[in-house]
C-alpha cells in the first residue's frame, strides 16, 4: 500500500492510502515511522501505525488533562474512555504515564492529606471516603494516613466552632454541637471529645444563666397563655432540656423565675 495523502487536521493528520483506507494519526506517529507521501507500507506496518497513533493520541489527551492539576489513575482512565480509545490502549497509556511519574496515586493521596493538615477541616474518615471515590486503593490511603496526626486539625476545627457557638448555647448543648460537627467532618468520637476537652475556653456559669433566663423569657410568653402552675413548670422544663440545658440549671432558674 502507498500513502497518497498526509493532511493536517487541527491536532491530528489525515492519512489516506491508495486502497481507499483512511486513518487519523498524530505528529509523533509520523516522526516515529518516518511517514511521507508516496511511502509504501505493509498491512503489518499499517496495524503498528494505527496502534501507535491511538496510543500517542491517548497519551496526548491524558497529558492535556493532567496539565491542569494532578489526577488519579481512575480519573485519567475515565477521561480517556470518553474518547472511545480501546481499553488495551488506555492501559498502555496509563502504564506509560505511571512510569514517567505523571500519575502516582500514593503522592496524590499524600498531597491531599497534607493540604488538609495545613488548612483543611476534614478527619481521616471523610478523607478516606473522598480518596476512595477517586479510585485510590484502601491500602494506599491507610499507608498515607499513618504519616499524619489529626489531633491538631481536630483542635483547630473545635476552636473555630467554639468561637461560632460560644455565648449562644449552654455548656451541654455546646459540647454536643462541637462533637457532632467534628464527627460529621470525619473525626472519631474519641478524637472529637479530646479536642473539645482541650479547648482553652469553656462556657462560664454566668453565661449559662444569662442564656437560660433569656430563653425563659421567650418560652414563658409562649406557654403562659395555655398553662399555669405545675403544668407550666413542666412545659418550660421540657423545652429547656431539649435545648441542651442541664436539669439542675433549669430547676435553679425556674425557682428564681416563677
UniProtKB/Swiss-Prot annotation:
Pfam family, one: RecX_HTH3
Top-rank taxon: Bacteria
GO BP annotation list: regulation of DNA repair
Classification via InterPro entries: RecX_HTH_1st (IPR053926), RecX_HTH_2nd (IPR053924), RecX_HTH_3rd (IPR053925), Regulatory_RecX (IPR003783), WH-like_DNA-bd_sf (IPR036388)
Gene3D superfamilies recorded: Winged helix-like DNA-binding domain superfamily/Winged helix DNA-binding domain
Keywords for the protein's UniProt record, in alphabetical order: Cytoplasm
Compartment annotation: Cytoplasm
GO cellular component: cytoplasm
UniProt family annotation: Belongs to the RecX family.
PANTHER family: REGULATORY PROTEIN RECX FAMILY PROTEIN
Function: Modulates RecA activity.
Stored NCBIfam families: PRK14135.1
UniProt-recorded name of the protein: Regulatory protein RecX
Chain's gene name: recX
